Amino acid sequence: MKVKLNFSRPILNLFIAVLFFATGPALTARENNTPDLKAFKIVVEKTGTGIKMKSLEGSAWLDLSFGLNDYRPQAVDEYGMTALNAVSSNKDTGLADFLFTVTKTENGIELKGIEGTAWIELSFSLAENEKQAIDQNGMITRY
């Protein structure tokens, strides 16, 4: 009688365990390296022709309104509308240092955080003339 040994299952389990323990500390270290974010609050409204934004905290501007075609992004920072290749080098310690793009989509708004946000991308449904508040950490309900 021959005994056939099956090592494929234990080897697979060992490989998964090594992979888990090898990547775990790297992922934890990455999460703990988030920079200190300064607070900002902005209310975003989708209009028939574009986007309206009202800053409640952390920026030099109070109201922004601009026309956008669907899927054409507009960069916004603490000083207002900007271009990604022409971001202001002036840094005011009394303002939040943020930069993101806002894009009007068929069903809502898409935001991409470039600087000064904990979020990389926010995407949400927004009907015409409906409002949504955001801050450095993401979407908020109270403002």
Question: How would you name each of these model-derived features?
Answer:
Residues 6-8, 49-50, 108, 132-134:
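Short amphipathic alpha-helical "recognition" segments used for binding
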Residues 20, 33-35, 44, 91-93, ...:
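Sterically constrained small-residue positions within well-ordered secondary structures
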Residues 1-32:
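Bacterial Sec-dependent N-terminal signal peptides
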Residues 46-48, 55-59, 66-72, 80, ...:
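A mature extracytoplasmic/lumenal domain signature
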Residues 98-100, 107-109:
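Mature extracytoplasmic or organellar-lumen-exposed domains after removal of signal/transit peptides
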Residues 25-52, 136-143:
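Sec-dependent signal peptide cleavage junction
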Residues 30-33, 64-98, 127-143:
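A low-complexity, Ser/Thr/Gly/Pro-enriched, surface-exposed linker/loop concept
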